[in-house]
From Swiss-Prot:
Compartments, record wording: Cell inner membrane
GO molecular function, one term: NADH:ubiquinone reductase (non-electrogenic) activity
Catalysed transformations (reactions): a quinone + NADH + 5 H(+)(in) = a quinol + NAD(+) + 4 H(+)(out)
Entries under SUPFAM superfamilies matching the protein: HydB/Nqo4-like (SSF56762)
Name listed for the protein in its UniProt record: NADH-quinone oxidoreductase subunit D
Family from the record: Belongs to the complex I 49 kDa subunit family.
Domain of life: Bacteria
Complexes and interactors: NDH-1 is composed of 14 different subunits. Subunits NuoB, C, D, E, F, and G constitute the peripheral sector of the complex.
Bilayer topology term: Peripheral membrane protein
Major subcellular site: membrane
GO cellular component: plasma membrane
Listed InterPro entries: NADH_Q_OxRdtase_suD, NADH_UbQ_OxRdtase_49kDa_CS, NDH1_su_D/H, NiFe-Hase_large
Task performed by this protein: NDH-1 shuttles electrons from NADH, via FMN and iron-sulfur (Fe-S) centers, to quinones in the respiratory chain. The immediate electron acceptor for the enzyme in this species is believed to be ubiquinone. Couples the redox reaction to proton translocation (for every two electrons transferred, four hydrogen ions are translocated across the cytoplasmic membrane), and thus conserves the redox energy in a proton gradient.
Lineage: Bacteria, Pseudomonadati, Pseudomonadota, Alphaproteobacteria, Rickettsiales
Amino acid sequence: MTNNTKTITLNLGPQHPATHGVLRLILEMDGEVVNNADPHIGLLHRGTEKLIEHKTYLQAIPYFDRLDYVSPMCQEHAFALAVESLLECKVPRRAQFIRVLFSELTRILNHTLNIGSQALDIGATTPLLWLFEEREKIMEFYEHVSGSRMHSNYFRPGGVVADLPEGLLEDIDKFIEQFPPKLHDIESLLNENRLWKQRLVDIGVVSQKEAMDWGFSGPMLRGSGIAWDLRKSNPYDVYDEMDFKVPIGKNGDCYDRYFVRMLEMYESIKIIKQCIEKMPKGAIKTDDPKLTPPTRAKMKESMEAMIHHFKLYTEGYDVPAGETYKAVEAPKGEFGVYLYSRGGNRPYRCRIKAPGFAHLQGLDFMSQGHLMADVITIIATLDIVFGEIDR
């Protein structure tokens, strides 16, 4: 007796709302069951790494905002740390606290979108609407410090571009006081919801070994029970002074990854509170005149200051020859920047390690044996953004 079962090849995307970007997925289906999932990437490739080679170190910063455009400040942070490492530049404490504060606000910004859109993919519309109200408040904080709601261009090698406006810390404090009850509301909708658990529990299971072998990081790694977080294991700026826990899952399924992200937001609130309480007075960028432009007041009084400002923004500054790799714990995982300098005002090579790139490669083994509808759930818990995957 011969088995004449015929598999079907199905194209999912790239114009599909559940692919979270321009993902083309070629699925080999046996009826409703997925045999293989082959992701085709590159539809949003802009050659960012090559473009950065032709820009000064200051001009390169906005390119990082446009990678994972849901969490821009975390990526600026990685690039700023890499340049500071080559320059051996000391960052003022106030600037370090501001960076950590906004990195954690960015984490909340990212996770609220992920959990909201994940719920929407599965059929629950309410969490998205509730969480978007909270995201709007964080985007206003972005706008207050940088003038932009999305592509902030706020972090700089040596500090941040501008100090916090008067009253902003009080506004952030009010936000984090009212935010936990909103998270409790989301949890009351989802955590023990029968349909939610049926769609997430035991779907897309990743063992600890598989997570390590595939190079997973962030909630994808911690969801499998590995307590690895760069803020703890390799702290940067003032994270070593912060008191927080690293949430981990047990089963490595979609439900654990959702829950890890939910718990991470509570930990981010703790860190933000500590930043507000400990925020020191002082400078917000290094006093090295080669890195920091003169103030507007000085430029109005001194021709030399005006020339200095013009030269700094047109020619930039020279960075000593050398190479470095700096990584931050971005909301999606380990975001790293390998920087190679030959001593000029432009990087010779800038290699970007995006966490979503590794996570998407694991979609094939995570989807095998599941139904077509479960693939949508798995894609949602990967938390992928094609700006950083395609670069």
